[in-house]
């Protein structure tokens, strides 16, 4: 017979660190080529002019310029980089 009570184990006591997603450069901000503009899961924001789309749906600048967010249609946003002149 046990003289001490057995220790119960916990199962739901874990949490993962946040993934640091979101907008990294906002509208009217200057960016250099290669700067990350948005980190996202899926295409919440769609790529416009002078931006690239990474395999993890990261949107990044292809040229130096100014970030511009636009409403593509009712449900879609797009982000472009306007060349700095």
Curated annotation (Swiss-Prot):
Annotated keywords: Ribonucleoprotein, Ribosomal protein
Record-level Gene Ontology MF annotations: structural constituent of ribosome
Matching InterPro entries: Ribosomal_bL27, Ribosomal_bL27_CS
Coiled coil: none
GO biological process entries: translation
Disordered: region residues: 1-23
GO terms under cellular component: cytosolic large ribosomal subunit
Similarity comment: Belongs to the bacterial ribosomal protein bL27 family.
HAMAP family referenced in this protein's UniProt entry, alphabetically: Ribosomal_bL27 (MF_00539)
Name of protein: Large ribosomal subunit protein bL27
Gene: rpmA
């Amino acid at each position: 017979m046990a003289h001490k009570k057995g220790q119960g184990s916990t199962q739901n006591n874990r949490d993962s660190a946040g993934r640091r997603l979101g907008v990294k450069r906002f509208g009217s901000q200057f960016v250099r080529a290669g700067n990350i503009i948005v980190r996202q899961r899926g295409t919440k924001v769609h790529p416009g002019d002078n931006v690239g789309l990474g395999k993890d749906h990261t949107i990044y600048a292809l040229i130096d310029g100014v970030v511009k967010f636009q409403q593509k249609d009712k449900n879609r946003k797009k982000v472009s980089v306007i060349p700095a002149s």
